[in-house]
């Protein structure tokens, strides 16, 4: 009788537990669905990185990298540029079922809970690449509530991002020691290589670092780093990413680091981009080959007193900057070496004369063989002279341009009109000529204003590539270019 009552009580208890667990399950599902709706996944946190600025030339050669706003060196790259070995090494060591679960590895979670209950201590973890990514993007204290939130967010994330997108995000956000974030910064720092160039041994070393970046830094703790690397290689064998023989061969390899010195190239050019003076993307138009040739040329031909030398080379077809050197020696503080002469406002000297000649020819106000007077001229408070102080008398327009004579240039400016010429030069990009025509007077044609070398070079590029409908016609531009070309100039100067 007592046995029958005991059995009845047990059955009632089981029935009540089943009923309550059913109700609790329903409530849990409702709460989960409500949370999913009311707390949508913060995708905006994953659309940008706390990234460094990486300035490169037109071919992708790094000119300079900066630290991120948080003081990190982070150089995000697409998964396609992560190389052959790093992604699979990360998966093998951090989350071998990454491609099979949906953000939370319930099998690993069950194992971890069982081990904790049996051993009363944590034996293995159950975090996934997805949950780690959630924590990297939005750090929280490592508490049980935080882990529940991370698991919830990981489940949400897997419905929005693909596995490749999640892996790419993780590879760009994982810590690798010091202030290094992401695989590209780590690959460059430790091996002076892009991730695509890493060997299996090098990739497996990096893949082991996110577990404990400070303790496993190979430049400070090589033995610990090697032990972790070897573990990664063994995990790659378990996951069948590599053969055992290959793993054994890699384990025998010592750690060979090649510390990276961050480049500091084309300093004036890069400074101008970082300071907002040049509106260019991170992959710039500069050609490092031309840049080095230009720097070498200036170094060879500049004296100690020549602090104001600057060169800018443009692609005449589109105005792209191919090389920019702002001074002979960037590091010469005494000589103001960090001043970028190509962006400083300076007198253009006689460099505006070809534009005046072209404009006058374009408007039918001048022909190359027309005779002009190179005689003394008295202006109010000013007596312009030629560079050598001599006057030639009657000269052709061709000879006047080649010899850069001042008095004929003033006559041409008078024919064009000061206002018209000033507006033309402003339209060609010389925006620093922003005073009135009365401010400059006739001296404008002789260098009376201030322009930037870069703007002047771009104006000449437009002249060289003149098209129908431009301010100066192709025909007039051709005539001026022909006069100033080598053969014409030599004939006029040397006979």
Can you say where each PLM-predicted feature lies in the sequence?
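Active-site-proximal helix/loop microenvironment
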Residues: 154, 219, 225, 250, ...
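A short, polar/charged loop-to-alpha-helix boundary motif
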Residues: 74-78, 329-344
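A penicillin-recognizing enzyme superfamily signal
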Residues: 284-304, 311, 324, 332-341, ...
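Short hydrophobic alpha-helical segments used for membrane anchoring or interfacial signaling
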Residues: 56, 312-316
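Short, well-structured active-site flanking segments
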Residues: 99-109, 181-184, 244-247, 335, ...
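Juxtamembrane regions of bacterial inner-membrane/periplasmic proteins
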Residues: 1-305, 320-322, 327, 375
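Active-site SXXK
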Residues: 89-91, 95, 236, 294, ...
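Conserved catalytic neighborhood of penicillin-recognizing serine enzymes
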Residues: 118-142, 196, 260-275, 366-421, ...
């Amino acid at each position: 009788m007592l046995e029958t009552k005991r059995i009845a009580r047990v059955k009632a208890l089981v029935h009540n537990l089943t009923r309550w667990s059913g109700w609790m399950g329903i409530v849990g599902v409702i709460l989960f669905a409500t949370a999913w709706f009311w707390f949508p996944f913060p995708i905006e946190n994953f659309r940008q990185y706390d990234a460094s600025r990486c300035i490169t030339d037109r071919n992708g050669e790094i000119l300079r990298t900066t630290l991120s706003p948080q003081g990190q060196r982070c150089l995000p790259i697409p998964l396609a540029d992560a190389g052959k070995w790093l992604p699979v090494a990360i998966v093998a060591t951090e989350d071998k079922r990454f491609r099979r679960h949906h953000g939370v590895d319930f099998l690993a979670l069950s194992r971890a809970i069982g081990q904790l209950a049996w051993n009363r201590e944590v034996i293995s973890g159950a975090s996934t690449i997805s949950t780690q990514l959630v924590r990297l993007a939005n750090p929280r204290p490592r508490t049980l509530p935080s882990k529940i939130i991370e698991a919830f967010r990981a489940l949400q994330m897997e419905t929005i991002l693909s596995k490749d997108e999640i892996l790419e995000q993780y590879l760009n956000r994982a810590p690798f020691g010091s202030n290094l974030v992401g695989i590209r910064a780590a690959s460059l720092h430790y091996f002076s290589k892009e991730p695509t160039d890493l060997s299996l041994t090098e990739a497996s070393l990096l893949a082991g670092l996110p577990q404990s970046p400070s303790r496993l830094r190979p430049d400070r703790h090589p033995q610990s780093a090697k032990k972790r690397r070897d573990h990664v290689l063994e995990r790659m064998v378990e996951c069948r990413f590599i053969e055992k023989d290959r793993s054994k061969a890699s384990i025998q390899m010592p750690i060979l680091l090649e510390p990276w010195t961050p480049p500091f190239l084309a300093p004036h050019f890069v400074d101008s981009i970082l300071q907002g003076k040049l509106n260019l993307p991170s992959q710039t138009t500069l050609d490092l080959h031309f840049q080095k040739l230009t720097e070498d040329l200036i170094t060879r031909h500049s004296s100690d007193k020549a602090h104001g030398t600057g060169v800018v080379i443009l692609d005449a077809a589109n105005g792209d900057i191919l090389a920019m050197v702002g001074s002979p020696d960037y590091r010469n503080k005494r000589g103001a070496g960090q001043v970028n002469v190509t962006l400083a406002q300076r007198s253009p000297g006689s460099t505006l004369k070809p534009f005046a000649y072209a404009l006058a020819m374009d408007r039918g106000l001048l022909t190359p063989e027309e005779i002009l007077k190179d005689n003394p001229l008295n202006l109010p408070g000013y007596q312009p002279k030629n560079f050598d102080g001599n006057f030639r008398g009657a000269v052709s327009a061709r000879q006047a341009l080649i010899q850069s004579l001042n008095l004929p240039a003033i006559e041409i400016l008078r024919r064009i009109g000061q206002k018209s010429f000033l507006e033309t030069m402003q339209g060609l990009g010389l925006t620093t000529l922003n005073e009135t025509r009365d401010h400059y007077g006739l001296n404008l044609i002789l260098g009376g204003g201030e322009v930037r070398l870069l703007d002047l070079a771009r104006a000449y590029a437009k002249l060289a590539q003149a098209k129908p409908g431009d301010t100066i016609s192709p025909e007039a531009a051709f005539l001026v270019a022909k006069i100033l070309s080598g053969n014409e100039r030599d004939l006029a100067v040397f006979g």
